[in-house]
UniProtKB/Swiss-Prot annotation:
InterPro entries: ITPase-like_fam (IPR029001), Maf-like (IPR003697). This is dTTP/UTP pyrophosphatase. It comes from Ruegeria pomeroyi (strain ATCC 700808 / DSM 15171 / DSS-3). The keyword Hydrolase applies. Nucleoside triphosphate pyrophosphatase that hydrolyzes dTTP and UTP. May have a dual role in cell division arrest and in preventing the incorporation of modified nucleotides into cellular nucleic acids.
Length: 192
């Protein structure tokens, strides 16, 4: 049995390390992450994590873990910005408001699937144009849903969260441990 992480995210690798787990392989899946017309953020996030875990090649006894993190402002999905201009628009829209960060986790072993999603609330302080410009020059917005990472420089913009910090970063640790135990990961033998 091999444990495969279906993600290229260094943050997810770090979070798994907090559980004492190192993947035997890292295989980021290639899927189309375009939201369907009218698709709601939570349904979108769950669909993407399922599609990711289905797209990873694995043996019948291997355990595959995939996740998707989505930033939602109301019904609007804020994905990974294409460029600095879009990142600035995202940050302006989040400024002074609460939004949701949804992380869906899917674990597959053979034909079985275990999944869970975690919804956290995040408040972003009012941002000045100077703060937005300075943040954009760091490049930290690149490849990040909603144009920010709470564990990076943008953490200074977040005075309040409700929910799971690790889920906001990209992998809810408590829920992930439960899913891996259900799938029979050796790290959790005897824990169920």
């Amino acid at each position: 049995m091999a444990f495969i992480l279906g993600s290229g995210s260094p943050r997810r690798l770090d979070l798994l390390a907090q559980l004492g787990i190192t993947p035997d392989a890292v295989r980021p899946p290639e899927i189309d992450e375009t939201p369907a017309k009218g698709e709601l953020p939570r349904a979108y996030c769950t669909r993407i994590s399922r599609e990711k875990v289905a797209a990873v090649e694995a043996g019948p006894d291997d355990i595959v873990l995939c996740a998707d993190t989505t930033v939602a402002l109301g019904r609007r999905i804020l994905g990974k910005p294409a460029d600095a201009d879009e990142a600035a628009r995202f940050l302006r829209s989040l400024s002074g408001r609460r939004h949701r960060v949804i992380t869906a986790v899917a674990v597959r072993r053979g034909g079985r699937l275990w999944e869970r999603d975690v919804v956290s609330q995040v408040k972003v302080k009012r941002l000045s144009e100077g703060e937005i410009s300075a943040y954009l020059t760091t490049g930290d917005w690149q490849g990040k849903a909603g144009a920010y990472a709470i564990q990076g420089p943008a953490g200074a913009f977040v005075p309040w969260i409700s929910g799971s910090f690790s889920a906001i970063v990209g992998l809810p640790l408590a829920e992930t441990a439960v899913l891996l135990a259900a799938a029979g990961h050796s790290k959790f033998k005897g824990d169920t």
